[in-house]
Regions:
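A beta-strand edge to alpha-helix "cap/lid" segment located at domain peripheries
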Residues: 1-3, 18, 39, 52-119
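Flexible loop/hinge segments that line or gate small-molecule binding clefts
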Residues: 43
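Short, low-complexity N-terminal intrinsically disordered segments enriched in polar/charged residues
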Residues: 1-30, 34
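Short, conserved phosphate/pyrophosphate- and ester-handling motifs at nucleotide-, phospho-/glycolipid
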Residues: 47
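A general alpha-helical scaffold signature found inside nucleotide-binding enzyme cores
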Residues: 11, 50-53
């Protein structure tokens, strides 16, 4: 992988999506700044340890999920996505995240989704 400071926000997000689908927590965490801020309706998590905790929860909620990202809107170093994920027993159909990128890493992310049982 190229040096993080030379990656565009689009390249960072592409890598982020690949490692998320693979369930690679270390790969996910590597895309975040040391001082990252991760905001959810449940609270604010900080740093790489906070990011790790957040994604352990997300991947625990949606293990081995099929992911869809129908909307990606970039503006400079900011991204908004809408997403869906379906696992064997649970799904999220209303996921929405925002990202702020800095120096080839994710500096801030907000996440919101509703977990429901699969019909």
């Amino acid at each position: 992988m190229e040096a993080t400071s030379t990656r565009t926000p689009q390249e960072v997000f592409q890598h982020h999506a690949e490692v998320l689908v693979a369930g690679d927590i270390d790969g996910i965490v590597s895309d975040y700044a040391d001082d990252a801020i991760f905001i959810t309706p449940s609270g604010i998590l900080r740093g790489k340890d906070g990011v790790r905790k957040a994604f352990e929860g997300l991947l625990g909620d949606l293990p081995n999920a099929d992911w869809e990202v129908p909307t990606t809107l970039f503006e400079d170093d900011v991204l908004l996505i809408e997403w869906k994920a379906t696992a064997a027993k649970t799904k999220a159909e209303d996921g929405i995240d925002t990202f702020v990128f800095r120096d080839g890493l994710i500096r801030v992310q907000t996440v919101r989704y509703t977990l429901t049982p699969v019909d």
